[in-house]
Structure formats: C-alpha cells, structure tokens
C-alpha cells in the first residue's frame, strides 16, 4: 500500500475539494446538481459550516471526507458525513475506511454519540464498506425517510 497523509481541510484546500466534489457527483450520476464553487466552499470552510479530512499520496489529493455538525434534540450534537470519496486510482488501498475511521475518532474524542450519512442504493462498494461496522439502516429499521427542498421550493413555500 502506498503511504498517504491525512490532514484536516483548510480553506486552501477548496480547489482540490471542489474538483473531487465534481468527480463524486459525476460518479453518482448527478454532475449537473453541483452549483457550489471553490470560492463558496472556501468561505464555508472558513465559517466552519463544513469540516473534513483530505488524504494525500505525495502531493496528489487522493480522497476526502467532508462532514458537518448537526443537532438532535434527542441526543445533542452529532456529525453528518456528507461526502466520503476516493479517486478511482487510489481505491482498494484502505483509504476510505481510514478517512471514515478518522471521523469516528473525532466523534468519540468529542463525546459525540451519533454519526449519520446517506448512500445511494446502487453504490454496492460503499455499502460493502459500511457493512464492515455496526450501524442502523434507519429506512429499514425505523421507517425514516429523508426529504429535501431546493432553493426554488424554499422560496415558493416562504412566499405563500
């Protein structure tokens, strides 16, 4: 296995991260959905709206784990893993699990007792990775569905 270095993301990583975000969106067959920019991401990192880890092999960014802090009235603060992505040429090296574990270690060290994420039902490799640890599929076990409003829907609702 090649040696890699994992660092906490900073605003200076925004260009590298947005590039991987576009790659992930293309992989997920949702490329046209990405409207974020490197500059907006840079500001969001500065403002602590998003956090993460970026893995490097040499000078080349190999993968990322982006997350944010959320809040549950039942358990308090928790972490939502937004994007766990490894570039194709760096897959099957244990990097995804290492980046994911880094987030679990952060949660443990901060006393955070919940880590949530979503995965597309056809992404069998990601699901196989997640199946290596204990978790609960909330759709199956508790019947939770996740819903989303886009900007147009928000404006329409707010303007009613």
From Swiss-Prot:
Family of this protein: Belongs to the acetyltransferase family.
The protein, known as: Thialysine N-epsilon-acetyltransferase
PANTHER family on file: DIAMINE N-ACETYLTRANSFERASE (PTHR10545), GH14572P-RELATED (PTHR10545:SF29)
Gene3D superfamilies: 3.40.630.30
Keywords attached to this entry: Acyltransferase, Transferase
EC number: 2.3.1.-
Catalytic activity: S-(2-aminoethyl)-L-cysteine + acetyl-CoA = S-(2-acetamidoethyl)-L-cysteine + CoA + H(+); O-(2-aminoethyl)-L-serine + acetyl-CoA = O-(2-acetamidoethyl)-L-serine + CoA + H(+); S-(2-aminoethyl)-homocysteine + acetyl-CoA = S-(2-acetamidoethyl)-homocysteine + CoA + H(+)
Subunit organization: Homodimer.
InterPro entries xref list: Acyl_CoA_acyltransferase, Diverse_Substrate_AcTransf, GNAT_dom
Stated role: Catalyzes the N-acetylation of the amino acid thialysine (S-(2-aminoethyl)-L-cysteine), a L-lysine analog with the 4-methylene group substituted with a sulfur. Substrate specificity: thialysine > O-(2-aminoethyl)-L-serine > S-(2-aminoethyl)-D,L-homocysteine. Does not act on polyamines, such as spermidine and spermine, nor on diamines putrescine and cadaverine.
Disulfide cysteine pairs (residue numbers): none
Species annotation: Caenorhabditis elegans
Pfam families registered for this protein in UniProt: Acetyltransf_1 (PF00583)
Phylogenetic lineage: Eukaryota, Metazoa, Ecdysozoa, Nematoda, Chromadorea
Location of the N-acetyltransferase domain: 4-159
Domain of life: Eukaryota
GO molecular function: N-acetyltransferase activity
Binding residues for acetyl-CoA: 84-86, 92-97, 123-126, 130-133
């Amino acid at each position: 296995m090649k040696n890699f270095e994992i660092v906490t993301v900073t605003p200076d990583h925004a260009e590298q991260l947005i590039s991987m975000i576009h790659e992930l969106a293309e992989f997920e067959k949702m490329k046209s959905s990405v409207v974020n920019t490197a500059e907006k991401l840079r500001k969001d990192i500065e403002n602590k709206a998003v956090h993460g880890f970026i893995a490097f092999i040499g000078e080349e960014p190999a993968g990322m784990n982006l997350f944010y802090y959320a809040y549950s009235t039942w358990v308090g603060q928790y972490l939502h893993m937004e994007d766990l992505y490894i570039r194709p040429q760096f897959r099957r090296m244990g990097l995804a699990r290492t980046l994911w574990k880094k987030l679990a270690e952060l949660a443990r060290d901060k006393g955070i007792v919940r880590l949530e994420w979503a995965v597309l039902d056809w992404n069998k490799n990601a699901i196989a990775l997640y199946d290596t640890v204990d978790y609960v599929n909330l759709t199956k076990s508790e019947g939770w569905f996740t819903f989303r409003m886009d900007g147009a829907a928000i404006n329409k609702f707010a303007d009613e």
